C-alpha cells in the first residue's frame, strides 16, 4: 500500500514524494502498481440519489507512467456502495470514512466483478501528449470497460 496524502502540507508532500519513489522502484523491478487515480471512492451525486461518479482524476498516475515509461492495464471495478454511504458522503467526511469501512466489511468474502482491459504499452501511451491528456485517455479506457 502506497499512501497518497491530499492535504496541502509539508508532511503530505513528503509522503507523496516517497510514494512516487517507491512506485517507480517497483515498476523498475516489473512489480505491478495499482493506482486509483481519483484517490477517492466514487460517490452518487444529487445528495446520494443521483448517478455514481468518480471524483476528478489527478495526474499523479500519469506522472509515474511517463517517468517509468510503463505499460498500463486498465481495470474497471463494478460495484455499488449503499445509499446510506452515498448520502453520508455529502454530509460529513468523517462519517463517509467510517461508512467506507462498513461497506468494505459488508463485501468481505463476496465476489466482485472486474473488467480487465488489454495492456497499453508505452509507445501508445507516449502519443497521448502531456499528463492531462494521458490522464483523460486512461480515464476513457477505463470507462469503456464499464460498458456492457
Q: Which residues does each predicted region cover?
A:
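Non-catalytic C-terminal accessory region of glycerolipid acyltransferases
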Residues: 13, 17-148
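Membrane-interfacial amphipathic helices and adjacent loop/beta segments
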Residues: 1-18
Amino acid at each position: 500500500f502506497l499512501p497518497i496524502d491530499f492535504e496541502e502540507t509539508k508532511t503530505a508532500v513528503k509522503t507523496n514524494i516517497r510514494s512516487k519513489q517507491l512506485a517507480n522502484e517497483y515498476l523498475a523491478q516489473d512489480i505491478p502498481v495499482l493506482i486509483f487515480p481519483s484517490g477517492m471512492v466514487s460517490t452518487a451525486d444529487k445528495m446520494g440519489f443521483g448517478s455514481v461518479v468518480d471524483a476528478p482524476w489527478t495526474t499523479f498516475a500519469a506522472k509515474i507512467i511517463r517517468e517509468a515509461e510503463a505499460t498500463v492495464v486498465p481495470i474497471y471495478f463494478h460495484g455499488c456502495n449503499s445509499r446510506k454511504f452515498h448520502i453520508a458522503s455529502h454530509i460529513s467526511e468523517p462519517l463517509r470514512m467510517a461508512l467506507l469501512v462498513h461497506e468494505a466489511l459488508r463485501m468481505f468474502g463476496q465476489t466482485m466483478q472486474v473488467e480487465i482491459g488489454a495492456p497499453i504499452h508505452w509507445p501508445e501511451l507516449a502519443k497521448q501528449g502531456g499528463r492531462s491528456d494521458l490522464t483523460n485517455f486512461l480515464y476513457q479506457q477505463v470507462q469503456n470497460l464499464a460498458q456492457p
